[in-house]
């Protein structure tokens, strides 16, 4: 072969190979601008210094959605179990369970309702704690699964209260073509959503059933493709039907078949008898009791219903109501008058009054829901708006919809509720309203096209420090130096949770160093310490915000901490060395990235304060684009979607109607949304607020971010006070709030076991325990730490702090925890 032919080709081939390698590398990561970058190819497994393997595990499935538009699907929301639907991870189906009750998803908590798509239809129940129901858990006699006492281990030798609600499956919504008896539904798909409402469909070979549900909505609106409305309800042999028009009648076993209901609307009183409720004050005494739940069904205008197919199922009596025509209907759970509970038999007069009001709103279909915050000085107002449209062929009331308000929405707020005569009254008259029981406290009935809540924005500072004298300033300079010298590099290199916490500790030293510089006897030494903190924080966080190692030519492996963008879910995923399923289930992103944002803010603050300092590396300008992506991951304020990646869902963690965040990404399991640490959620929203207010480098998005961050910060603080700490200044309401409502029932809960707070709230349970241990210090600490300049809400009321009985923990346990010991308490 002629060598002259090869001579020019060889350099060309080498150049092509280099270009090809460069293109392949560039395709593995993307920079949003500046020095930061993120991976778009999953990082390979890597090794830690101790030779342990670190891997990134991506979500097993993508969104279960069939919806128009460009939006990314929310996670960490009340309806997420419908979107995060993994066929390999569905509820257990015990041997002998009827096919009708096989779940097509996990339970979904809209509150006051809970529902679950099943093969036999949409199973529905009131999400209600029954604190009298007897039961066992772990061989421990309880006052019921409604109030469980869990022995939490030898280390604490204590009892951990555990409050939860039940899914009794009182109604099954379906159609004449696919209902309870056919057990034919095979799939469920999300078809649309707004800020706190969702649309989904259930399909069988013969039917498509479309459902509209909302957080705080007592209604479920159903539209059918082909069949007529059909509802199966349980009556436990002693139920009663109350039509809107006509006489009521019993539905005892075998008596209901063929019974006509000559009204489009009727209610069912579901009386469930129980026996031998355990009385903590006297274990020898037992007491029979019943619970009463009232459900309402609304057929098309001019329709009637016929009861058919009465049958027994697992001790229950089931009756099926078939509608005379139409392809739409609605179901609802009715409230009780204030002062009555699920243990009190409801009056027919109240039921008919409620039926009339609910019937006039049942077919005002909610087509959109929106929350809009406005910041004014030190307060923020959030407006909640419903958009409704009449279902075809119906003429609902024109004043909007009915909704159930949580305590944070009506307590000490200028909103209206419906009183006992169905007129509007101020929420300060809550004892004259209608309510549903809930774990968080009574939910009040209200109507309209929306409402507004106003909250004071708590103090939010970069750090908390007094004005030190020279001696104190000098000591603090030495402590800053000591913190730098003793920092464990292995701990600093941990994953996206503990590593982020350690970087955050560095960042918290920056404002402290700035504050003490002027008082120190040697300002140069203080300045040197501050610069050392700045450099280490900037270098460490900068490394975390790059997808490549320092050479910039290859993609990091999972042990080197690259952030990977998952276009299916629209999220930045960290490697899961210590991430508590932040990768595979998208848990806790607001915790992890909140620490990153706070660190970035303090680095930027130092640079803004020292623009001409020769040590100013321009970190903020270089990494602000990546910081903004992390902010959008946890708190994107755009609903419409850009249609181009990277894009993110609207408010990933913060649930506007609930008033706080949910930390669980998938909400899998039958507990629904879950959040343990309110303090870390609050820290995240405070970090966003400080970043927006600092506005360095200046960016137009920060003005919008500021009002949303202030709203989430203020609302999360309010929810933490009410629901996790059970605290309100309204002494009259206090016995009804959160876990305190159980303390008010001496025949249901032994008062010594009622805690001063709860450490974890799920949508169907709240517990005074943590996922990582149960000494009281840990159970309290998860609601306190990190203590920062945004933690001042914890000390707003000294009386409340004293009541939490934390003084002993601070004096005896805190030093031991700081020394790495496990406190005996």
Language-model segments: which ranges?
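N-terminal secretory signal peptides that target proteins for export/translocation
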Residues: 1-8
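Bacterial N-terminal signal peptides
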Residues: 11-21
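Sec/Tat signal peptide C-region and signal peptidase I cleavage site
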Residues: 22-26
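Ser/Thr/Asn(+Pro)-rich, low-complexity disordered segments
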Residues: 27-588, 637-660, 695, 708-825
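Aromatic-rich carbohydrate-recognition surfaces in CAZymes
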Residues: 493-516, 520, 583-619, 623-627, ...
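Flexible, surface-exposed loop/gating regions in the mature catalytic domains
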Residues: 568-572, 576-580, 609-620, 624, ...
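Short secondary-structure subsegments characteristic of cysteine-rich extracellular domains
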Residues: 619-631, 703-720
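Active-site neighborhood of glycoside hydrolase catalytic domains
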Residues: 678-715
């Amino acid at each position: 072969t002629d060598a002259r032919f090869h001579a020019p080709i060889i350099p060309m081939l080498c150049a092509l190979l280099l270009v090809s390698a460069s293109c392949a590398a560039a395709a593995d990561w993307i920079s949003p601008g500046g020095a930061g970058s993120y991976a778009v190819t999953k990082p390979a497994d890597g090794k830690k210094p101790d030779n342990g393997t670190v891997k990134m595990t991506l979500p097993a499935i993508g969104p279960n959605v069939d919806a128009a538009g460009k939006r990314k699907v929310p996670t960490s929301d009340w309806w997420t179990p419908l979107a995060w639907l993994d066929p390999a991870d569905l509820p257990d189906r015990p041997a002998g369970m009827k096919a009708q009750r096989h779940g097509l998803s996990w339970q979904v908590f809209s509150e006051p309702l809970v529902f679950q798509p099943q093969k036999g239809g949409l199973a529905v129940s009131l999400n209600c704690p029954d604190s009298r129901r007897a039961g066992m858990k772990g061989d421990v006699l309880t006052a019921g699964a409604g109030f469980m006492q869990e022995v939490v281990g030898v280390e604490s030798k204590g009892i951990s209260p555990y409050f939860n609600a039940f899914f009794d499956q009182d109604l099954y919504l379906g159609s004449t073509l696919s209902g309870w008896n056919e057990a034919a539904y095979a799939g469920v798909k999300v078809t649309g959503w707004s800020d706190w409402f969702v649309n989904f469909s259930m399909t069988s070979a013969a039917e498509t059933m479309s459902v509209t549900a909302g957080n705080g909505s007592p209604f479920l609106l159903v539209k059918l493709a082909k069949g007529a409305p059909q509802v199966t309800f349980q009556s436990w042999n002693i139920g009663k039907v109350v039509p809107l028009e006509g006489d009521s009648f019993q539905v005892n076993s075998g008596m209901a078949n063929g019974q006509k209901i000559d009204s489009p609307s009727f209610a069912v009183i579901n009386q469930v008898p129980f026996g031998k409720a355990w009385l903590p004050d006297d274990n020898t005494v037992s007491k029979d009791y019943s619970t009463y739940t009232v459900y309402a069904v609304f057929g098309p205008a001019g329709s009637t219903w016929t009861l058919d197919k009465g049958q027994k199922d697992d001790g229950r009596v089931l009756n099926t109501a078939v509608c005379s025509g139409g392809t739409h209907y609605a179901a609802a759970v009715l409230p009780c008058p204030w002062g009555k509970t699920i243990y009190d038999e409801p009056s027919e007069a109240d039921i008919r009054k409620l039926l009339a009001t609910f019937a006039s709103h049942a077919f005002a279909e909610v087509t959109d829901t929106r929350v809009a915050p406005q910041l004014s000085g030190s307060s923020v107002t959030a407006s909640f708006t419903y958009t409704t449209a009449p279902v075809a062929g119906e003429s609902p009331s024109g004043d909007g919809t009915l909704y159930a308000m949580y305590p944070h929405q009506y307590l000490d707020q200028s909103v209206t509720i419906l009183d006992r005569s169905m007129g509007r009254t101020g929420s300060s008259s809550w004892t004259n309203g209608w309510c549903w029981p809930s774990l968080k406290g009574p939910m009040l009935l209200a109507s309209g096209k929306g409402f507004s809540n106003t909250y004071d924005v708590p103090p939010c500072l970069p750090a908390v420090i007094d004005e030190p004298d020279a001696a104190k300033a000098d000591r603090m300079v030495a402590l800053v130096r000591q913190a730098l010298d003793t920092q464990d590099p292995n701990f600093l290199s941990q994953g996206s949770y503990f590593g982020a916490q350690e970087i955050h500790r560095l960042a918290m030293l920056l404002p402290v160093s700035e504050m003490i510089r002027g008082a120190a006897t040697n300002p140069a030494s203080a300045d040197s310490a501050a610069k050392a903190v700045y450099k280490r924080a900037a270098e460490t966080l900068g490394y975390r915000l790059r997808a490549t190692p320092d050479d910039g030519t290859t993609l990091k492996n999972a042990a080197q901490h690259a952030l990977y963008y998952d276009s299916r879910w629209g999220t930045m995923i960290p490697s899961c060395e210590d991430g508590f399923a932040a990768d595979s289930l998208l848990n806790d992103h607001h915790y992890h990235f909140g620490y990153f944002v706070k660190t970035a803010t303090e680095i930027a603050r130092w640079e803004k304060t020292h623009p001409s300092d020769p040590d100013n590396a321009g970190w903020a300008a270089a990494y602000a684009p990546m910081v903004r992506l992390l902010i959008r991951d946890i708190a994107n304020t755009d609903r419409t979607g850009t249609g181009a990646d990277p894009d993110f869902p609207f408010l990933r963690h913060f649930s506007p109607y609930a008033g706080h965040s949910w930390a669980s990404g998938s909400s899998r399991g039958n507990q629904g949304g879950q959040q343990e640490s309110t303090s870390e959620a609050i820290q995240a929203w405070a970090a966003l607020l400080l970043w927006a207010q600092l506005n360095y480098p200046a960016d137009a998005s920060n003005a919008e971010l500021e009002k949303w961050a202030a709203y989430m910060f203020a609302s999360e603080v309010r929810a933490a006070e009410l629901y996790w700490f059970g605290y309100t200044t309204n002494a009259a309401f206090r016995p009804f709030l959160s876990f305190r409502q159980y303390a008010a029932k001496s025949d249901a809960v032994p008062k010594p076991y009622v805690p001063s707070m709860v450490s974890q709230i799920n949508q169907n349970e709240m517990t005074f325990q943590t996922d990582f241990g149960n000494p009281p210090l840990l159970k309290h600490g998860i609601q306190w730490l990190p203590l920062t300049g945004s933690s001042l809400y914890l000390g707003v009321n000294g009386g409340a702090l004293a009541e939490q009985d934390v003084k002993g923990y601070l004096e005896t346990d805190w030093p031991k925890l700081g020394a790495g010991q496990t406190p005996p308490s």
